[in-house]
C-alpha cells in the first residue's frame, strides 16, 4: 500500500521557501564519554576465574542429569537455570530432559507443575496444547503460585488460544497482593510478573535481578548460585571489551562531534545488542549490530531534526541509487552520514552477494523516514493504517534483523534470503512490537519536538478517543502481536537458524525493556541508566 498522502495534502516544499533554521531535538550529551569507557576495569577478564567456573559447570551437569529426580524437581531446576542466565551452558542436557518429559509425562494434578511444564516446553519449541489446563484452572484458584505460573505461561499463547487469556489470572493475582499475610517470595514474583511478564523481559537483566532474588531463597543451591554469579561477571567482562571496541570505532567516525543535533547514545546502542544476543561467543555480532544501531540513530535524527525536505529527498535518492552524485547539494554533515554508512556496508559485506540485501534494507528504512518527513512538513496526520504500514519499517527492526541474519547464518540459505528480502513474519512482528513499544514510551517527548504523530495520536484522531483509550488500544495491539510472534517462532516451516529467531524475539523483548519507563534510548532516563550500570559496569560480589 502507498503510505504517502495524496498530492492535495501537501504542496511541494522547496529549500527556498522553507525556514532553514534547523530544528533541535534538545538531546542531552552522553552520560558515558570515551575516556570513561576505555578506563573501565573488570577483574573477571582473562582466564583467572575459568578453572573454578569449569569445575562448577561439570558439577552442575551431574546434578542436572542425576537419576531419581522427580519430574517437577527437574522442571524447577531448568527454570532456575534459565532465570539465572546459565541455561545456555546446558542446552543438550535440558533438551534431553524436556524431550523425555514430553514423551513420557503424565498429567499433573498441580496447576503450578502443569503451568511450569507448559511454559518450558513451549519456550523450547515443543508442541503442547492448551488443553493441558482443562479442568485445572477453575479448581485451583487458591493456589497463588499456580495462578502466577499460569499467568506467566499465558504469554506464550498463540492466536485463538482462549484458555490462556490473562485477564482472570491477573485479577486474582492483584487481589492476592492486597492480603497482609502472604509469602513475600511469591509476592515479589507476582509484583514483577504484573509489571512485565517473564516472556517479555530482557534475558540478561532478568538474570541480574533473579540472582539477587535467588540468593535469599531457602531452597537456594549454593553450587548453582556461585556458578550464576561467576558466569554473569565473566560474560560482563567480555561485553566490556566489545563496548571498548565500538567506542573506538564511534570516535573515529567523527559523527558525534560533527552532528551535534543527533543523539550520541553509543552505550545505549550497545545495551540493545546485549538484549538481542548476550552470549559471550557472539562478540562480533554485538560489535557490528552496535554500529548498525548507532548509524540508525544518527540517520533517524538527520530526517527527524536536521534536514529540509529537499535535502532529505536528495539523501534518500543517494541511498536508493548508492550514487555520490546525489550528494552535491547536501550539507557536509549529511555527506559524512552517507559515507559512514557506505563504508560500514562495505566493511561488513565480505561477500559481494550480501551487499544488495544490506543496501535494500537501508534503502527501505530511508524511504520510510522520507515518508514521515513529508507528513511532518505538510502537517498531515496519517490514518492508523497508513501509519502502521510505514512505521514497522521506520522503527529500523528490519535493518537490524537483516544484518543479524548474515552475522548468524553459516552458510547462508537461498530460501532464507527470499524470506529475508520480503521481511518474513518473524521480522515483521518483532518490528511491530518494537514500533508500538517505542510509541508508548516516546510519543509525548517526540510531539513536543514537533515530530510526526505516532500511533497513539493517529488512533486518537481517527477514532476520536482520549489519549488513555488510545494507549490502551496500543497495549492490546502489543499483546496480540506477541501472539503472532509466538506463532511464527513455533512454525517449523522457515529456513532461519534458531539463533536468528531467538534474536528476533529478543529484539521485541528489548523494546519492552527500553521503553518500559519512557524513552530509555534518547531520553537517558534514570531507570535505563541504572539498568546499564547493573548490567555493564557493576560486577556481582561473590556469595
Swiss-Prot record:
Please give the pathway this protein is involved in: Secondary metabolite biosynthesis; terpenoid biosynthesis
Q: Which BP terms from GO are recorded?
A: circadian rhythm; diterpenoid biosynthetic process; green leaf volatile biosynthetic process; limonene biosynthetic process; terpenoid biosynthetic process
Identify the residues that bind Mg(2+) 1. 300, 304
- Tell me the superkingdom of the source: Eukaryota
Q: What are the annotated GO cellular component locations?
A: chloroplast
Subcellular location, record wording: Plastid, Chloroplast
User: Found in which tissues?
Assistant: Confined to flowers.
**Gene3D superfamilies assigned:** Farnesyl Diphosphate Synthase, Terpene synthase, N-terminal domain
The induction comment states: Enzyme activity levels follow a circadian oscillation, reaching a maxima at the transition from day to night (diurnal rhythm).
UniProt keyword list = Chloroplast, Lyase, Magnesium, Metal-binding, Plastid, Transit peptide
Q: Which reaction does it catalyse?
A: (2E)-geranyl diphosphate + H2O = (S)-alpha-terpineol + diphosphate; (2E)-geranyl diphosphate = sabinene + diphosphate; (2E)-geranyl diphosphate = beta-myrcene + diphosphate; (2E)-geranyl diphosphate = limonene + diphosphate
Under PANTHER family, the record lists:
OS04G0344100 PROTEIN-RELATED, TERPENE SYNTHASE 10
Q: What is known of its domains?
A: The Asp-Asp-Xaa-Xaa-Asp/Glu (DDXXD/E) motif is important for the catalytic activity, presumably through binding to Mg(2+).
Q: What is this protein called?
A: Terpineol synthase, chloroplastic
Task: Give the organism the record lists.
Answer: Nicotiana alata
The gene behind this protein is: TER
